[in-house]
Amino acid sequence: MVKIVSKALIKNRNGKYLLLYRGDTHPNFPGHLDLPGGEVESEETSKTAAAREVQEETGICIHPNGLKKLFVKQYKNTRHVLFEIAIDKTESDISVKLSWEHKKYRWMTLSELLDTNIPESADPYYIYVIDYLKHLSEA
């Protein structure tokens, strides 16, 4: 059975993206950069799962209809779905409340995000996101 993981790239009014740092005790890729998201549960769509996970991991409430699908990638037995949502607020207007899964967060410009050092052992999902954004920035 294929597992579906749904994540959201959150962009604020200033064009900065919300990046999370996984906690040191996270079972997968501890300490690595991440986006809010997680597994799609049986009764959910990938959009509703992304909205739920954003709220659980950051405290930010978004509506699933505001999510725009950017890509779907298959890696081994997992289907990765990435959405984007624009929030008409600045980072100082957005209260981020992290769950146990993450230890800190940072708002980054696209160039900061693309210049981030990606370890060889990075989550394939995160590598897909960076590759996708690089492709867009070159277009």
Sequence positions of predicted segments:
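Active-site-adjacent beta-strand/loop module that shapes the phosphate/pyrophosphate-binding cleft
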Residues: 3, 12, 71-94, 106, ...
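Conserved N-terminal beta-strand and adjoining loop/helix that marks the start
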Residues: 1-18, 39
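A structure-centric signal for secondary-structure junctions around beta-strands
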Residues: 5, 14, 29-30, 79, ...
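A short coil-to-beta-strand element that immediately follows conserved catalytic motifs
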Residues: 61-70
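Nudix hydrolase/Nudix homology domain
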Residues: 30, 99-139
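Conserved Nudix-box catalytic region and its N-terminal flanking loop in Nudix hydrolases
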Residues: 16-56
